[in-house]
């Protein structure tokens, strides 16, 4: 009997069904046009692209009006080039992707070709389409495979891969459709906002992004920011010393536990992945630090002077206890390579932050690289929200539909499969111990091999995959292993995982991107042949049909999960490798009470129930209730991870607003040839600020304040003004300080105009832009570091009954305002130091000795960096140099000091 809710749903349909019903009408229109499109010859079909583009340019039609006809053209082109006719469900997927939504399409439903539909349509506007994949292999494969289609239709295709030169990247982005990875798109965006010449940028705007495996990129990797960094101070020796001390404490703690002693030095919180020192642990580490000379007698590890030491100690404990080799990372060629916890892939070039990577390098006794300082950063969440139009596709999105909507404003639409799903998903089997579970898995594999059924075994770490591999080797079962150690042969291994009796062990199947075809991949076999004649091809196809039939008879691909992942979505991705395109298949997960998910997150009720049953060694429980209990534990973890990602975004949104302001201002600077008006406005603000600092009251009450202002103008702006004399001569200035302010501004402006006249407007403009851009970058880098420090400690405000998020927003805004004020001050200060005396009106502007060939403006404590030399610009403008500056001449910087006492001193130090 139908419940009222089910009856209501049956009559009115759910939202997903209603959306698909509406889109089905568009599919009917595409099918209706198919006959007319089929009548066109190749030339007429290809010319449709120009016809569509003219319609858009003239404003007669927009993309939505063109969709049915454009999709019909792409479908017919695919049929002619690849001999494949797109299913109606693929057309539905294309419509969903064009509608700023996420399309959930099951494995094997043809997502790669589906993506060509919205990619073609959106490329017609000429603004570029970015197709985003999870790795370089997929980006290259999809671009090469789809290139014949797009080129037939008159569109260009680019591939954006790491290691390409700027000109090659620029060419890739200029193409109508660009394939690349999420990392590369994000890093290119950050690099583009660090250039000094507009022509050095590679991207041409963020119009439309279509993300493959969207859940992997927008959810799994949402907590990992993209960071461009530079080297910081060398602290490798300190990491090594602290590593030895922490290792000795861990060993001592282990001995205490083995000897049943109650004294513990630290506790481990696996849920929050933290190691917490106990009172005894704190006393011991302080004693060891003092004994080794790292800390002074009588000091505390928690004193403000030792915050960095505490940071190193925490990193060392986490490295030893929470991070495991061949689970979280690999050691290869003297390097620590991070393993992606979601995909099982190695991530070369990635490094953990906060000193953790250095702590792991110390733990594994490899070369410890310097810590890095952030130069620019952005999260994937905020990067992809910069696109005007965003969509994505994956086989598993519905479980994360709420997060997609709440964070990215993307609805999730589930596309029905072309054929009914007939895979048999068996209930989970749970054992008491890990050993019993492994035994049961091996027995299941043996049974499958006996009946010639292919098996895919999914593990969550390299360590687990090698345990299974070792057990299979001992009983003589041939198998292949796919993990971070052997990822180079990934596509070949997966392509042939459907062979009769094949056993494939894979670590985290998420995002592998290659379908498992029952009977093996005959196309891959043909491609592997150097010279494929018709007879060989026919034999390969004939053999494949026999193998395909044998696999179907044995039950199709059997998927074994060695434990549940934290996310149900990853489990569904593993299961989804079986039962593609209506194929028969099966899946089962084997669990034990020692699995981390059950041990950390499962409810006490489940654990107690297992104990009460009094299970004997080797016994197992198989019941839907167990599966539901595990799913509930996974949901708890998913909700917790969602809260973490949401909180991360809320904090990053603060930095993102500031990043947007900085990048917009920087972009504006790059595109203006003459920024003298900007300098003029900034100069007014700086003089106003100076007065507010040194003479805050309405009237001048203290001559000492005026003297300090006078000293500041001379030191920071090379402006010698007799302010005290002016006041003595004109007593009214005591009360009318606005007149004094205006006079200072006029003198500063006159000095500036004089400098422009001497140097030349073009050179001065180049200087000003260079100074402003470099000051932007240096202060932004320091601001990011300050924001990071603020973020790390802001949670402590909660103890004072204050909202940490509101406090973070308030303080970061205050810091940002101060940074902008500092920026103005530094720019005007540096520009003011560019005063150059005219030695010869008709000859050169600046002449120097051979040693003095790298004249630079004075470094300040804040900038601590060298600005581009005047000589560089003079050479660019073909100015000659033939007069020598002697040691006793006035320094050409305009400081009125002798050259030997000013920049001559700097030159001598440098040489």
Curated annotation (Swiss-Prot):
One Pfam family this sequence matches: SecA_SW
Example of a GO biological process term: protein transport by the Sec complex
Induction / repression: Repressed under conditions of excess protein secretion capacity and derepressed when protein secretion becomes limiting. This is regulated by SecM.
Positions that bind Zn(2+): 891, 893, 902-903
SMART domains: SecA_DEAD, SecA_PP_bind
Catalyzed chemical reaction(s): ATP + H2O + cellular proteinSide 1 = ADP + phosphate + cellular proteinSide 2
Membrane topology of this protein: Peripheral membrane protein
Segments traversing the membrane: none
Gene3D superfamilies per record: Helical scaffold and wing domains of SecA (1.10.3060.10), P-loop containing nucleotide triphosphate hydrolases (3.40.50.300), SecA, preprotein cross-linking domain (3.90.1440.10)
Compartment annotation: Cell inner membrane; Cytoplasm
Binding residues annotated for ATP, in chain numbering: 90, 108-112, 515
Catalytic EC class: translocase
Keywords, comma-separated and alphabetical: ATP-binding, Cell inner membrane, Cell membrane, Cytoplasm, Membrane, Metal-binding, Nucleotide-binding, Protein transport, Translocase, Translocation, Transport, Zinc
Source organism superkingdom: Bacteria
Keyword Transport: yes
Classification via PROSITE patterns: SECA, SECA_MOTOR_DEAD
InterPro entries: Helicase_ATP-bd, P-loop_NTPase, SEC_C_motif, SecA, SecA_CS, SecA_DEAD, SecA_motor_DEAD, SecA_preprotein_X-link_dom
Gene Ontology MF terms in the entry: ATP binding; metal ion binding; protein-exporting ATPase activity
CDD domains: DEXDc_SecA, SF2_C_secA
Keyword Membrane listed: yes
Cofactors required: Zn(2+)
Role summary: Part of the Sec protein translocase complex. Interacts with the SecYEG preprotein conducting channel. Has a central role in coupling the hydrolysis of ATP to the transfer of proteins into and across the cell membrane, serving both as a receptor for the preprotein-SecB complex and as an ATP-driven molecular motor driving the stepwise translocation of polypeptide chains across the membrane.
Family as reported in the entry's similarity comment: Belongs to the SecA family.
Full protein name: Protein translocase subunit SecA
Source organism of the structure: Blochmanniella pennsylvanica (strain BPEN)
């Amino acid at each position: 009997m139908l419940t009222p809710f089910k009856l209501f749903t049956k009559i009115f349909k759910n939202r997903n069904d209603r959306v698909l019903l509406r889109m089905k009408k568009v599919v009917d229109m595409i099918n209706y046009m198919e006959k007319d499109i089929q009548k066109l010859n190749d030339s007429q079909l290809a010319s449709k692209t120009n016809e569509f583009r003219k319609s858009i340019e003239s404003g007669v039609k927009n993309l939505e009006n063109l969709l049915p006809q454009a999709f019909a053209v792409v479908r017919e082109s695919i049929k002619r080039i690849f001999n494949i006719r797109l299913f109606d469900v693929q057309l539905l997927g294309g419509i969903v992707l064009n509608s700023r939504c996420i399309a959930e399409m099951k494995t094997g439903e043809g997502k790669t070709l589906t993506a060509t539909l919205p990619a073609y349509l959106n490329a017609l506007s000429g603004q570029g389409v970015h197709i985003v994949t999870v790795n370089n292999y997929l980006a290259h494969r999809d671009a090469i495979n789809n290139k014949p289609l797009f080129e037939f239709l008159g569109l260009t295709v680019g591939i954006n891969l790491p290691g390409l030169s700027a000109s090659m990247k620029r060419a890739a982005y200029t193409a109508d459709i660009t394939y690349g990875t999420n990392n590369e798109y994000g890093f290119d965006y950050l690099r583009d906002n660090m250039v000094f010449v507009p022509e050095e940028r590679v991207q041409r705007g963020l119009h439309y992004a279509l993300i493959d495996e969207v859940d992997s990129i927008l959810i799994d990797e949402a907590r990992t920011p993209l960071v461009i960094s530079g080297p910081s101070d060398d602290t490798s020796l300190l990491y090594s010393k602290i590593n030895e001390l922490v290792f000795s404490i861990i060993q001592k703690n282990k001995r205490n536990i083995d000897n049943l002693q109650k004294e513990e030095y630290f506790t481990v919180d696996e849920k929050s992945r933290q190691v917490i020192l106990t009172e005894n642990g704190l006393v011991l580490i302080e004693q060891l630090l003092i004994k080794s000379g790292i800390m002074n007698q009588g000091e505390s590890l928690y004193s403000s002077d030792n915050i960095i030491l505490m940071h190193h100690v925490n990193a060392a404990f986490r490295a030893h206890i929470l991070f495991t080799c061949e689970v979280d990372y690999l050691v290869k060629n003297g390097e620590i390579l991070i393993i992606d916890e979601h995909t099982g892939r190695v991530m070369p070039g990635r490094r953990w932050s906060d000193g953790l990577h250095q702590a792991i390098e110390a733990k594994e006794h490899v070369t410890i690289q310097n810590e890095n300082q952030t130069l620019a950063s952005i999260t994937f969440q905020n990067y992809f929200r910069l696109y005007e139009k965003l969509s994505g596709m994956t086989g598993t999105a519905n479980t994360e539909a709420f997060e997609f909507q709440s964070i990215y404003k993307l609805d999730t639409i589930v596309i029905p499969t072309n054929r009914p799903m007939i895979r048999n998903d068996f209930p989970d089997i749970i054992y008491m111990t890990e050993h019993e579970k492994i035994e049961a898995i091996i027995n299941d594999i043996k049974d499958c091999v006996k009946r010639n059924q292919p098996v895919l075994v999914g593990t969550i770490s390299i360590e687990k995959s090698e345990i299974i591999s070792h057990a299979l080797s001992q009983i003589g079962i041939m198998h292949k292993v796919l993990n971070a150690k052997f990822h180079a042969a990934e596509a070949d291994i997966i392509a042939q995982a459907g062979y009769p009796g094949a056993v494939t062990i894979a670590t985290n199947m998420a995002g592998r991107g290659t379908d498992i075809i029952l009977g093996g991949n005959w196309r891959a076999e043909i491609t592997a042949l150097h010279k494929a004649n018709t007879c060989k091809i026919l034999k390969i196809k004939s053999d494949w049909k026999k193998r395909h039939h044998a696999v179907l008879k044995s039950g199709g691909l059997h998927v074994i999960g060695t434990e549940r992942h934290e996310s149900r979505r990853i489990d569904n991705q593993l299961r989804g490798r079986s039962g593609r395109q209506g194929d028969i298949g099966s899946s089962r997960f084997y669990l034990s009470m020692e699995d981390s998910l059950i041990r950390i997150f499962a409810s006490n009720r489940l654990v107690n129930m297992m104990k009460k049953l009094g299970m004997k060694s080797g016994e197992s429980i198989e019941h839907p209730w167990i599966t539901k209990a595990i799913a509930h534990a996974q949901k708890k973890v998913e909700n917790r991870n969602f809260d973490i990602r949401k909180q991360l975004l809320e904090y990053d949104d603060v930095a993102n607003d500031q990043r947007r302001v900085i990048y917009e201002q920087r972009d504006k600077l790059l595109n203006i040839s003459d920024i003298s008006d900007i300098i003029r406005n900034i100069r007014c603000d700086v003089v106003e600020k100076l007065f507010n600092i040194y003479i805050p009251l309405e009237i001048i009450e203290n001559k000492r304040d005026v003297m300090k202002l006078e000293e500041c103008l001379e030191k920071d702006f090379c402006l010698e003004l007799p302010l005290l004399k002016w006041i003595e001569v004109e007593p009214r200035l005591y009360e009318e300080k606005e007149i004094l302010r205006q006079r200072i501004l006029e003198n500063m402006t006159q000095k500036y105009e004089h400098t422009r006249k001497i140097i030349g407007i073009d050179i001065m403009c180049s200087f000003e832009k260079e100074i402003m851009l470099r000051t932007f970058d240096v202060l932004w880098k320091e601001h990011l570091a300050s924001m990071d420090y603020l973020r790390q400690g802001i949670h402590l405000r909660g103890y004072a009954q204050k909202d940490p998020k509101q406090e973070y927003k308030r303080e970061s805004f205050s810091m940002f305002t101060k940074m902008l004020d500092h920026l103005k001050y530094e720019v005007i200060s540096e520009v003011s130091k560019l005063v150059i005396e005219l030695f010869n009106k008709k000859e050169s502007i600046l002449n120097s000795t051979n040693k003095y060939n790298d004249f630079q403006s004075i470094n300040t404590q804040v900038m601590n960096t060298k600005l581009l030399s005047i000589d560089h610009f003079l050479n660019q403008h073909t100015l000659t140099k033939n007069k020598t500056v002697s040691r006793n001449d006035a320094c050409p910087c305009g400081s009125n000091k002798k050259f030997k006492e000013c920049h001559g001193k700097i030159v001598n130090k440098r040489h």
